[in-house]
Amino acid sequence: MKVEIDSFSGAKIYPGRGTLFVRGDSKIFRFQSSKSASLFHQRKNPRRIAWTVLYRRHHKKGITEEVARKRTRKSVKAQRAVVGASLELIKERRSLKPEVRKAQRDEKKKADKEKKKADKAARKSEKAKLAAAQGSKVSKQQAKGAFQKVAATSR
């Protein structure tokens, strides 16, 4: 025994029951009752009609006991070695006291400042040597003399 399903309401249609509606594009619609056929022809939305299967599915009626709550897995953080830092080194750095870490940071900053200062001084001395070797550069415009603006004769 083949049981069909109503195209509008989703109800079961047993053999010998219901009607068929064939649309112009040859799509077949089966209706269990004239009520569902009428509502279909009025272009009603079955999701908005309370007694249809689609309405019940859309508004989550009568399926609460079937669906079990999905369990979410909690992520666990794990320490891993990174390129350029082994796991032991990372653990050692983490275990340092904040005061010690601050002192190390200040020391590193000071060393970097000194290095930057030394680099700057070296570059400056090198630039001075080059300037002394070449002599002073004078552009053609400077050699000609500054442009003299003509004084206006009218008042």
Swiss-Prot record:
Q: Where is this region: Disordered?
A: 94-155
Q: Where is this chain compositionally biased, Basic and acidic residues type?
A: 94-129
InterPro entries this protein is in? L24e/L24_sf, Ribosomal_eL24, Ribosomal_eL24-rel_N, Ribosomal_eL24_CS
Q: Tell me the Gene Ontology biological-process terms attached to this UniProt entry.
A: cytoplasmic translation
A Pfam family that this protein carries is: Ribosomal_L24e
Signal peptide start and end residues = none
Gene Ontology cellular-component annotations: cytosolic large ribosomal subunit
Query: Which molecular function term from Gene Ontology is one that the record holds?
Result: mRNA binding
List the keywords (alphabetical): Ribonucleoprotein, Ribosomal protein
Task: Describe the family membership recorded for this protein in Swiss-Prot or TrEMBL.
Answer: Belongs to the eukaryotic ribosomal protein eL24 family.
PANTHER family from the UniProt entry: 60S RIBOSOMAL PROTEIN L24, RIBOSOMAL PROTEIN L24
What is the protein's given name?
Large ribosomal subunit protein eL24
Per the UniProt entry, what species is this protein from, by scientific name?
Answer: Kluyveromyces lactis (strain ATCC 8585 / CBS 2359 / DSM 70799 / NBRC 1267 / NRRL Y-1140 / WM37)
